[in-house]
């Protein structure tokens, strides 16, 4: 396809009149706006058709190397394992294929057995757990259309099941209730003294800051353990909620107090930002199942708990791009079923895409997708421009077509001038569905040019569907919300002891879903499947269809601190590569909201503290900017230039001694060796300063969150490796 043919194709569109636009915009803002221009598409097409870097054709003038010439119209050869990657040996050669056949057969058998096990568990719960009044209350819960009605129904179900008594009892094995109770009491006392004012009020304000530095951190004393939100449909322990409210009130008091200097406040909130971290929303891939993310976004937005840092991969990247380039007011108008009228990426008939697949090796045309995608990204908007417009940080995971090069997480820090729609296309370029594409960058004059020497990129889900490690490196993301819709992963999601907002109902929450035997069999089969997938990968048994190691789509981490699993139906698999109708998108929006409602209380408790810290940072002249954040809002992630004052260390030591003495008296504390000699200054370690009450955190660290059993991939271990292949834009 040439540039001229592309221009003719784009100009064939019939123009609309103003009257037509008013009648057919379906209430969507910018419905008829074409944000991208033909020149940008032409530059993209030139970059796609540009020849790759030529290989060596002569050793010297007298020794030419004759290269094979590919005939026109012939598909490029799919890359295979090179000689360096192929194992040698007689036994390996003889046993590789028989062993691979045995392993694949065993995996198929285990998969069938797993489906039967899940069916048994569903029947067990249907006949033994959800009966009578429980079932009626559960149906009422699932039929709600907004969060307020859902919350009322959840409270009614909790009351019927007797979960309110669990909330009132502070003791629980998964957090340190004694430490939390002591800190709440001290916060309340110091806050009252600070509000009273006077000489004692100023000293109390300093002590309050010291205590806040010690307790405002990620998962302090285990209060962010998901288990604390998995025993009820709504809410958590009353003591935990009391801590959240008291910490929020105390931070507000410090923020507005006249008894503290501006320098003291600035140092405090920088410290808290480093210790507490940021919340990030990750949207997985999943083809057209990614439209369930719209419902997740709508639920978070309507309840004002949508994080500013958003990551998307494959189909999730398209949703994330829409969110990151629109304001809250625009999003509320766009997240409606009528948005389906704007989703036309899969409208070609079978005769069209079948011929294209035969000619190009991919079902969809890159240029058509570029035009469709540009509306969701507001034309050739770059990552930096999107950040400056909305204050949201967009991250898109892309994988190089070379199987051994590192992945990139494109955002306004690593690739500020990269055009968003090109990154979204690259993240969605599944082999056989869409050919690898070239990323584009915007030059100072506004024109586009190839990014990273014209290297081509493909679907990020193949290796880093949920790039949590990279997000932590760049943005100090210590709390993750993952919306997971991949069909090959959703099938195997099962929480035998309940999840956030979805407790086990029988035996007062202390039982197992499907009984102990059902849960044990489910867990055993799942772990055995994971084991054999790793065996195939490490023994290099799998071939590479379409030049891709497909074992990575199973052997990644797909969950976060809070994982949202929208409930799909079998028809979704049939329409997995089809545009949604208004009715289907309405159902997806509803299901996305329904599965998000149980998680909102957990998320809102986290965001309540995080936003007060952000407000405190905005009062810092070095951080405040024109938007919600400064152009460098994450500076404290690596800031090591803020030493603690000597008197603050002395106050910290005195207060820490008092707290430790109280815990020793109650028998809830054991001495542990300190990592710093007495009198040595406290300095940041690896970009994070030790808190003033590190001992309390260390003692409470025995209560760990539930972790994912799946081993992270190599890309998760090393998410960002300096972009040695020219992946940064100057």
Curated annotation (Swiss-Prot):
**Compositional bias ranges of the Polar residues kind:** 721-730
Q: Has keyword Transmembrane? A: yes
A GO BP annotation: lipid catabolic process
Which segments cross the bilayer? 97-117
The record gives the membrane topology as: Single-pass membrane protein
Q: Which residues form the PNPLA domain?
A: 281-472
Q: Which InterPro entries match?
A: Acyl_Trfase/lysoPLipase, NTE, PNPLA_dom, Triacylglycerol_lipase_N
Q: Which GO terms describe its molecular function?
A: triacylglycerol lipase activity
The enzyme's main class, written as a single word, is: hydrolase
Which keywords are on file for this protein?
A: Hydrolase, Lipid degradation, Lipid metabolism, Membrane, Transmembrane, Transmembrane helix
Enzyme Commission (EC) number: 3.1.1.-
Gene3D superfamilies, per the entry:
Cytosolic phospholipase A2 catalytic domain
Q: Where is this motif: GXSXG?
A: 312-316
Q: What subcellular compartments does it reside in?
A: Membrane
> What family is this?
Belongs to the PLPL family.
- Cite the PANTHER family for this sequence: NEUROPATHY TARGET ESTERASE/SWISS CHEESE D.MELANOGASTER (PTHR14226), TRIACYLGLYCEROL LIPASE PTL2 (PTHR14226:SF66)
Protein's job:
Probable lipid hydrolase.
Official protein name in the record: Patatin-like phospholipase domain-containing protein CIMG_04897
State the organism named in the record.
Answer: Coccidioides immitis (strain RS)
Provide the taxonomic classification: Eukaryota, Fungi, Dikarya, Ascomycota, Pezizomycotina
């Amino acid at each position: 396809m040439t540039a001229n043919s592309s221009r003719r194709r784009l100009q064939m569109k019939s123009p609309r009149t103003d009257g037509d636009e008013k009648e057919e915009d379906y209430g969507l803002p910018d419905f008829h706006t074409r944000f991208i221009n033909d020149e940008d598409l032409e530059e993209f097409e030139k970059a796609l058709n540009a020849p790759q870097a030529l290989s060596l054709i002569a050793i010297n003038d007298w020794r030419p190397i004759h290269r094979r010439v590919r005939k026109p119209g012939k598909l490029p050869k799919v890359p295979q394992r090179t000689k360096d990657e192929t194992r040698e040996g007689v036994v390996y050669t003889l046993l590789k294929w028989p062993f691979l056949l045995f392993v694949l057969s065993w995996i198929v058998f285990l998969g069938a057995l797993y489906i039967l096990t899940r069916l048994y568990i569903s029947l067990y719960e249907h006949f033994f757990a959800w009966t009578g009044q429980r079932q009626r209350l559960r149906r009422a819960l699932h039929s709600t259309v907004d969060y307020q009605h859902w919350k009322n129904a959840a409270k009614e179900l909790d009351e019927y099941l007797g979960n309110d008594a669990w909330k009132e009892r502070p003791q629980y094995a998964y957090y340190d209730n004694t430490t939390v109770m002591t800190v709440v009491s001290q916060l309340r006392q110091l806050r009252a003294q600070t509000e009273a004012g006077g000489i004692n009020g100023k000293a109390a304000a300093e002590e309050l800051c010291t205590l806040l530095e010690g307790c405002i951190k990620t998962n302090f004393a285990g209060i962010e353990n998901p288990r604390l939100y998995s025993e009820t449909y709504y809410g958590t322990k009353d003591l935990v909620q009391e801590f959240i409210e008291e910490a929020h009130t105390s931070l507000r008091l410090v923020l507005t107090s006249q008894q503290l200097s501006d320098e003291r406040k600035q140092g405090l909130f920088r410290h808290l930002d480093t210790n507490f971290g940021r919340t990030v929303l990750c949207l997985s891939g999943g083809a057209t199942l990614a439209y369930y993310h719209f419902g997740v976004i709508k639920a978070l937005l309507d309840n004002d708990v949508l994080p500013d840092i958003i990551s998307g991969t494959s189909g999730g990247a398209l949703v994330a791009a829409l969110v990151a380039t629109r304001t809250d007011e625009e999003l509320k108008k766009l997240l409606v079923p009528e948005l389906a009228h704007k989703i036309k990426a899969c409208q070609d008939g079978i005769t069209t895409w079948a011929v294209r697949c035969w000619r190009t090796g991919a079902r969809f045309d890159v240029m058509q997708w570029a035009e469709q995608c540009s509306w969701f990204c507001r034309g050739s908007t770059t990552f930096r421009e999107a950040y400056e417009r909305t204050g949201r940080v967009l991250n898109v995971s892309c994988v190089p077509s070379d199987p051994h090069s590192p992945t990139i997480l494109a955002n306004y820090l690593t690739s500020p001038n990269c055009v968003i729609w090109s990154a979204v296309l690259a993240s969605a370029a599944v082999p056989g569905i869409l050919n690898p594409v070239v990323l584009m960058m915007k030059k100072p004059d506004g024109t586009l040019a190839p990014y990273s020497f014209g290297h081509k990129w493909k679907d990020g889900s193949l290796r880093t569907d949920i790039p949590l490690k990279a997000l932590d490196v760049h943005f100090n993301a210590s709390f993750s919300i993952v919306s997971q819709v991949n069909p090959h992963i959703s099938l195997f999601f099962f929480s035998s002891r309940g999840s956030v907002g979805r407790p086990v109902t029988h035996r007062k929450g202390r039982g197992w879903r499907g009984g102990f035997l059902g849960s044990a069999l489910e867990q055993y089969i799942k772990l055995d499947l994971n084991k054999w997938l790793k065996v195939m990968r490490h023994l290099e048994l799998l071939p590479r269809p379409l030049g891709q190691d497909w074992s990575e789509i199973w052997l990644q981490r797909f969950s976060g601190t809070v994982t949202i699993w929208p409930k799909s139906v079998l028809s979704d698999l049939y329409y997995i590569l089809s545009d949604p109708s208004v009715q289907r998108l309405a159902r997806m929006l509803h299901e996305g909201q329904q599965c998000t409602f149980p998680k909102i209380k957990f998320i809102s408790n986290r965001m309540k503290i995080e936003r007060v810290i952000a407000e405190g940072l905005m009062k810092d002249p070095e951080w405040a900017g024109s938007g919600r954040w400064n152009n460098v809002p994450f500076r404290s992630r690596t800031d090591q230039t803020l030493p603690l004052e000597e008197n603050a260390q002395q106050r910290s030591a005195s207060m820490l001694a008092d707290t430790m003495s109280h815990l020793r008296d109650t028998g809830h504390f054991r001495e542990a060796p300190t990592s710093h000699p007495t009198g040595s200054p406290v300095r940041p370690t690896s970009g994070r300063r030790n808190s003033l009450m590190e001992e309390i955190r260390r003692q409470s660290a025995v209560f760990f969150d539930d972790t994912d059993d799946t081993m992270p991939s190599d890309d998760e271990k090393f998410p960002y490796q300096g972009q040695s292949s020219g992946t940064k834009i100057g």
